[in-house]
């Protein structure tokens, strides 16, 4: 580089240092993209901009990547280490410099032809200042590039809203070996790079925004809404104009009013807020979503719903991943001042809890959703319908998902892909309110005062987690499961073919399974799981560390799913982090520390335990069986677990099929044997008395679930003809009684939805016949197996209410072996 050019870059870099604060995507490009800084890198930028080049250089130096301003010297030939695909627009249009990218690509390919050991990494990088999509019909399109003067003002105004996006590298060695090294390949490389940057920019900025009134006019002109308006006028005996005004009022209630400036401002506020409230936001598997957006997919984000914070956190994460914040389906309860107008500008559109009896509303909403898909906006909705009060996934509500498929049946949309997302927290600000609601308190209506009270509680929130699950392409799903689905395409009438409901139900279940597959274990949910497993809710520091180590080894050596994330910290680091959250008490004595979960915190901590209960449910069940039997063959263990696995699978959205269960159990048994929690004697699995303490705590994780199943099966066995409604009601009443008598603090223990799912599963699995009567022989077999795993006191409580005298006089199961309770603080 010449001396004058060095001076020029230094002078240009002075204002850029002050004005530009760019974000890098992905956050750690070297590890996430598999870059090798020791090998030569050719940086490829979309168009000639010195501001972009120097912004890239700053990030390269920060990431320990080669300097793009230093040329590469290979075999005595010196070539630039960066290339611009286009020269870009100029202030003076008549000056069009010669394009150098094709020549440079050809030179590099030539070097590979002459040097078989050479392998240069071609690294596409885009630098963006601002991400305004612009308005339809206003000025130049948003994909335009900027000339020097425009770039100056962009840097001045948007320097702190800029990002540097690194893409996956292309091996020039592979290109040379597979496609040759002539100029045709160089031209092709430049053309493919140009398309790559264009798609990437569209994924980051999104399509132009329509004027709200223009959108309403277009919706009003649709055949479906015209018909619904005519039906409204006829059924309510009002004028056509009045019915049309009703439709416009509904559009005003529903539609978002997306504003890029509002997104920019909220990003500043949220960045400041997250940095003070959270110790970190952990994001995993975002690259798969960036790739979907770049490939032109219409993305529908379907996260689990833990907190009102979900709306803001997910939009914030997506924005920082270089993606357009989605249009979000929010409950109408959030449409209060000032939150409603703010959420609208951030992309929220509002949805009522029920559409029943209002055909005009359902038509307007469906057409609005379809229009979002047609225009190419990403959409987000919570398939659970509302926030989980227990920390578990709720049964999915399928209305909006059904409308998504109906939007495909209008024709003309891009390929729609559902992206399940697991959102996890170490502290959920509403968890105290959830506990009150589960105890019968009336849910407060959201308002400004409630919002301010919530903001007051925002402190020391620990870590947040956003894990993107395995995408589910709708077209691929329908082609596989409903090959004739295209026969139902109709651009006017909303279609409800016979296959729609079963397909939607199956899709909803797959989404929930994939959300759970992407679960995040963390310090809070692991410590809560261990302490709640102790009957005294207390463990010595050594016991707790031992139990955390047991959980971590299980999750690492026998992982639940490839998308599940496990902390890379030691048990000591996790415990210290959890103690800093001020949820637990520490009592010190001369022997050591005792970690205590206070009584008032116990119910709240079940929320965090339930976030990951599905990850440990099968190891807990194995531990429980070995604890009771002391000696059991693998075959017998598999038989017993197979009987109740369908109930666990339906309740916790587990992903293992019946065919996968034997192999899964073998893997878990091998890991428990490796940890010496059990002894594998070849023909039998045997209890290891030396490690009974961690085994007992592990077994406790399934205790309450099995008790709940035993309640329903005992009622079915005693009264085979009981109807479904009565069975669910009686089960809940008995569960509440059991929780009072035996100190069970889990709010989901008598949750209505849990018993509803259980009864439905019993019917599907053949325990209840088509006539509605229980098959007593089957229900008794499972009940006897479950009751043997419970303490005599719990069994007696259940049978004293549900089982008639002759049924209770079954041959007694072997006495439950005496096993020492882990030492800890006893209850006062």
From Swiss-Prot:
A motif (HXXXXD motif) lies at residues 304-309. The keyword Cell membrane applies. Keywords: Acyltransferase, Cell inner membrane, Cell membrane, Lipid biosynthesis, Lipid metabolism, Membrane, Phospholipid biosynthesis, Phospholipid metabolism, Transferase. Its EC number is 2.3.1.15. Its main location: membrane. Residues 802-828 are annotated as: Disordered. It holds the Pfam family Acyltransferase. It is found in: Cell inner membrane. GO terms for cellular component: plasma membrane. It is an enzyme of class 2 (transferase). Pathway: Phospholipid metabolism; CDP-diacylglycerol biosynthesis; CDP-diacylglycerol from sn-glycerol 3-phosphate: step 1/3. GO terms for molecular function: glycerol-3-phosphate O-acyltransferase activity. One of its GO terms (biological process) is CDP-diacylglycerol biosynthetic process. It is a peripheral membrane protein. It catalyses: sn-glycerol 3-phosphate + an acyl-CoA = a 1-acyl-sn-glycero-3-phosphate + CoA. InterPro entries: GPAT/DHAPAT, GPAT/DHAPAT_C, GPAT/DHAPAT_LPLAT, GPAT_PlsB, Plipid/glycerol_acylTrfase. Belongs to the GPAT/DAPAT family. NCBIfam families: plsB (TIGR03703), PRK04974.1 (NF003441). HAMAP family: Glyc3P_acyltrans (MF_00393). The HXXXXD motif is essential for acyltransferase activity and may constitute the binding site for the phosphate moiety of the glycerol-3-phosphate. This is Glycerol-3-phosphate acyltransferase. It comes from Yersinia pseudotuberculosis serotype O:3 (strain YPIII).
